[in-house]
C-alpha cells in the first residue's frame, strides 16, 4: 500500500492508526490532539479529503472555510467481481473504463473498470470493479465490496482548485486528489505543490 511504501523509507518515529480529534495553531506551532494527548509540530500536511481536513481544524480561517468547504463528496459502493455481463458484449471494444446506460432518460451510467487493462495484470480470470451496480452483479461472482467517497466537481470547485497556494501557509498545507480530477496521480501532484507552496525544503 501507499502507507507501507512511505513508512519503509521514513527514518523518523511514525504513529499509525491514531485517532486525531483536533488540529490547531498556537504561538507559531501546530498542535495535534491525538489519543487524548497534545503533540506539537512545526507544520501539518492534511493528506485527506477536503471535508475531512476542515472537520479536523479547530478554528479554520475564512480562506480555509471557503476553499475547503467548496468541495463536496458522494459515497459510492465499489464491487470487485468477475461478472463480464457488466462489460460490453463485444469483447474487442473492452476498455479500462466502461459504462452501460439502460435507459437514456432515467438511468444512471453503470461504470465498470477493467483492472486487467488498468493495472496491466494477467490473471486467469477477468477482474472488474463496478460502481453502484451491485444489484446487477451475479452474487457468486463478487469477490469484495467497498464504500468509497469521491469528490463532486462543479464550476465553484474548479475555481477553488486554483487557490491551493492560498491556504498552504501558516503551518498548514493541504493535498489530495480533489485539487485535480480525483485520480491518484492528482493526489501526488497536489502533494508536490503543497510542499512548494508551503516553502518547505524536503
Question: Where are the model-predicted features located?
Answer:
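C-terminal catalytic lobe of FAD-dependent flavoproteins
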Residues: 136-202
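A short acidic-Thr-Gly-centered motif at the start of a beta-strand
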Residues: 6, 35-37, 164-168
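Short, hydrophobic alpha-helical segments
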Residues: 10, 14, 42, 198-202
Amino acid at each position: 500500500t501507499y502507507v507501507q511504501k512511505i513508512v519503509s523509507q521514513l527514518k523518523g518515529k511514525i504513529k499509525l492508526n491514531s485517532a486525531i480529534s483536533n488540529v490547531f495553531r498556537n504561538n507559531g506551532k501546530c498542535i495535534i490532539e491525538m489519543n487524548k494527548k497534545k503533540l506539537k509540530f512545526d507544520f501539518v500536511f492534511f493528506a485527506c479529503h477536503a471535508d475531512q481536513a476542515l472537520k479536523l481544524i479547530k478554528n479554520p480561517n475564512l480562506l480555509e472555510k471557503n476553499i475547503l468547504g467548496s468541495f463536496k463528496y458522494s459515497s459510492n459502493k465499489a464491487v470487485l467481481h468477475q461478472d463480464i455481463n457488466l462489460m460490453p458484449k463485444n469483447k474487442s471494444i473492452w476498455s479500462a473504463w466502461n459504462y452501460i446506460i439502460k435507459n437514456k432518460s432515467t438511468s444512471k451510467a453503470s461504470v465498470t473498470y477493467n483492472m486487467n487493462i488498468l493495472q496491466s495484470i494477467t490473471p486467469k480470470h477477468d477482474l472488474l470493479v463496478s460502481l453502484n451496480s451491485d444489484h446487477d452483479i451475479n452474487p457468486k461472482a463478487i469477490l469484495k465490496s467497498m464504500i468509497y467517497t469521491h469528490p463532486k466537481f462543479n464550476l465553484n470547485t474548479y475555481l477553488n482548485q486554483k487557490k491551493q497556494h492560498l491556504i498552504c501557509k501558516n503551518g498548514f498545507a493541504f493535498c489530495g486528489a480533489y485539487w485535480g480530477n480525483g485520480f491518484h496521480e492528482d493526489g501526488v501532484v497536489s502533494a508536490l505543490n503543497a510542499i512548494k507552496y508551503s516553502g518547505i525544503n524536503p
